[in-house]
Amino acid sequence: MNGVLNDIKTEFLCNTKTDLLTLIQKICLNCDFILEPVESFPKKTELVAVMYDTLAVEIFNDLLKYNEQKKDGLA
């Protein structure tokens, strides 16, 4: 997940960790789907890690799509 967060930081020009966390908070506040998968955690820690990695990849992909739309003037 750290790699994904670093990619988000680079792609969206977040200069500080606070900027990155603010971006993630805005995403979380605007995406209902994020809350649904994490309401009940699997008992095994590695499954939680996989779930968070998958979620991070989904968020990053959505951000990339949004960023492309923004560049094209569609967002």
Swiss-Prot record:
<protein>
    <recommendedName>
        <fullName>Protein U62</fullName>
    </recommendedName>
</protein>
<dbReference type="InterPro" id="IPR035385">
    <property type="entry name" value="U62/UL91"/>
</dbReference>
<comment type="similarity">
    <text>Belongs to the herpesviridae UL91 family.</text>
</comment>
<dbReference type="Pfam" id="PF17442">
    <property type="entry name" value="U62_UL91"/>
</dbReference>
